[in-house]
UniProtKB/Swiss-Prot annotation:
It comes from Saccharomyces cerevisiae (strain ATCC 204508 / S288c) (Baker's yeast). Component of the Mediator complex, a coactivator involved in the regulated transcription of nearly all RNA polymerase II-dependent genes. Mediator functions as a bridge to convey information from gene-specific regulatory proteins to the basal RNA polymerase II transcription machinery. The Mediator complex, having a compact conformation in its free form, is recruited to promoters by direct interactions with regulatory proteins and serves for the assembly of a functional preinitiation complex with RNA polymerase II and the general transcription factors. Keywords: Activator, Nucleus, Phosphoprotein, Transcription, Transcription regulation. Pfam families: Med6 (PF04934). It comes from the Eukaryota. Belongs to the Mediator complex subunit 6 family. Present with 4824 molecules/cell in log phase SD medium. The lineage of its organism: Eukaryota, Fungi, Dikarya, Ascomycota, Saccharomycotina. GO terms for biological process: positive regulation of transcription by RNA polymerase II; positive regulation of transcription elongation by RNA polymerase II; positive regulation of transcription initiation by RNA polymerase II; regulation of transcription by RNA polymerase II; RNA polymerase II preinitiation complex assembly. Transmembrane segments: none annotated. This is Mediator of RNA polymerase II transcription subunit 6. GO terms for molecular function: transcription coactivator activity. It is found in: Nucleus. The modification Phosphoserine is found at residue 225. Component of the Mediator complex, which is composed of at least 21 subunits that form three structurally distinct submodules. The Mediator head module contains MED6, MED8, MED11, SRB4/MED17, SRB5/MED18, ROX3/MED19, SRB2/MED20 and SRB6/MED22, the middle module contains MED1, MED4, NUT1/MED5, MED7, CSE2/MED9, NUT2/MED10, SRB7/MED21 and SOH1/MED31, and the tail module contains MED2, PGD1/MED3, RGR1/MED14, GAL11/MED15 and SIN4/MED16. The head and the middle modules interact directly with RNA polymerase II, whereas the elongated tail module interacts with gene-specific regulatory proteins.
Length: 295
């Protein structure tokens, strides 16, 4: 059976939210329903103790709305001194929400793994920290307990996620960098070629616009030649002047029996028969003045 890693898991419980709602006061209770929560943590122990204490003494309640609390030795201490070991962000949460101040006071009496509300951005973002409390020297000590952070979780709306570790983040960044670097090298490899005479060199880029223009001109030229071979639909007095190239080809064919004539010397390719320039001029004038016959 494949188990999804916790850092790839997204969990939510719409049914729980529909019954109890989701706010800062009960966000830890909502988190306790998720698979991220450790049932052996101190939070679970305190939760069970509260349930039994409420059954034994229904009128038991602690007023935590004041800034002064009574210490076990009977002396009053200032909350700033009591929670001096807590970071300022969490300290503001403790002062604003008395229930978390009471939870912190109870956690101070225990050693082990615990969950605390680390950051709040109402109405839809909370950060919960998993930490280990060790060397607990008791309530009211100036030194305070030693706290080791273990893991952070964040709640966005109704979804709970486990924050990735530094190793996962660096690994993801390195894999992304390696992928893009490999793609770049493959693109560069396609731009070079090897020739025995020149060695390795870059290919000459082909101008696609020039190629497209040449192809278009070729199509237009082909279309023009096709149009010239079609008989016009106008009157009978319309005539077409044949090109010099066609006349020369005709003369060459007539005078040499299909052999080629050198236009510069006026001689055939084999030198057996020849046509003078004067004969070519007469044939040119005759062909221009004549009326062409269309096929």
């Amino acid at each position: 059976m494949n188990v999804t890693p916790l850092d790839e898991l997204q969990w939510k419980s719409p049914e729980w939210i529909q019954v109890f709602g989701l706010r800062t006061e009960n966000v830890l209770d909502y988190f306790a329903e998720s698979p991220f929560f450790d049932k052996t943590s101190n939070n679970q122990v305190i939760k069970m103790q509260r349930q039994f204490s409420q059954l034994n003494d229904p009128n038991a309640a602690v007023n935590m709305t004041q800034n002064i609390m009574t210490l076990p030795d009977g002396k009053n201490g200032n909350l700033e001194e009591e929670f001096a070991y807590v970071d300022p962000a969490r300290r503001q949460i403790l002062f604003k929400y008395p229930m978390y101040m009471q939870l912190e006071e109870e956690l101070m009496k225990l050693d082990g793994t615990e969950y605390v509300l680390s950051s709040v951005r109402e109405p839809d973002f909370w950060v919960i920290r998993k930490q280990r409390r060790t060397n607990n020297s008791g309530v009211g000590s100036a030194k305070g307990p030693e706290i080791i952070p273990l893991q952070d979780y964040y709640i966005i709306g109704a979804n709970i996620y486990q924050s990735p570790t530094i190793f996962k983040i660096v690994q993801s960044r390195l894999m992304s960098t390696s992928y893009h670097l490999n793609s770049t090298l493959e693109s560069l490899y396609d731009l070079i070629e090897f020739q025995p005479s020149q060695g390795v060199h870059y290919k000459v880029p082909t101008d696609t616009s020039t190629t497209a223009t040449a192809a278009t001109n070729g199509n237009n030229a082909g279309g023009g030649s096709n149009k010239s071979s079609v008989r016009p639909t106008g009157g009978a007095n319309m005539a077409t002047v044949p090109s010099t190239t066609n006349v020369n080809m005709t003369v060459n064919t007539m005078g040499t029996g299909g052999q080629t004539i050198d236009n510069g010397t006026g001689r055939t390719g084999n030198g057996n028969m020849g046509i003078t320039t004067e004969m070519l001029d007469k044939l040119m004038v005759t062909s221009i003045r004549s009326t062409p016959n269309y096929i």
